[in-house]
Amino acid sequence: MGKAYYVKFETPEDLVNPILEAVRVASTSGKVKKGTNEATKAIERGTSKLIVIAEDVEPPEVVAHLPILCEEQGAAFAFVPSKQELGKSLGIDITSAAAAILDAGDAQHIVDQVVSSIAKIKGGKTDQ
């Protein structure tokens, strides 16, 4: 099965672990919002450092608005293959379709690296 229609670009495998690590570290040392609704609010308020969206969300309409909203608001965003892994990185026992890093805490250098890498993947467009 191909990627969901809302996945705007292919996240390289070597970038997935740093993204999940950034979420993991930021959730303990910074501030992270869990879930699609919280991520949406963070984008709209302009408080997100990085939005992380799972690629395996069913139905896809749940998160389909996030990449569009991120592009409109100039927010950095990235995709991870699994909502299960995203949930684990957030330190919760359930899946999470999306997350918003508001304060990276000790993960700031990882977030900066991810945002920079994503900008290059997207063709040099800067999101922040």
Swiss-Prot record:
Oligomeric form and interacting partners: Part of the 50S ribosomal subunit. Probably part of the RNase P complex.
Top-level taxonomy: Archaea, Nitrososphaerota, Nitrososphaeria, Nitrosopumilales, Nitrosopumilaceae
Keywords: Cytoplasm, Ribonucleoprotein, Ribosomal protein, RNA-binding, rRNA-binding, tRNA processing
Top-rank taxon: Archaea
Pfam families listed in its UniProt record: Ribosomal_L7Ae
PANTHER family in the cross-refs: RIBOSOMAL PROTEIN L7AE FAMILY MEMBER
Gene3D superfamilies named among the record's database cross-references: 3.30.1330.30
Name of the molecule in the record: Large ribosomal subunit protein eL8
Localization per record: Cytoplasm
GO molecular function: ribonuclease P activity; rRNA binding; structural constituent of ribosome
Residue intervals passing through the bilayer: none
GO biological process: translation; tRNA 5'-leader removal
A GO cellular component entry from the record: ribosome
Similarity annotation: Belongs to the eukaryotic ribosomal protein eL8 family.
Role according to the record: Multifunctional RNA-binding protein that recognizes the K-turn motif in ribosomal RNA, the RNA component of RNase P, box H/ACA, box C/D and box C'/D' sRNAs.
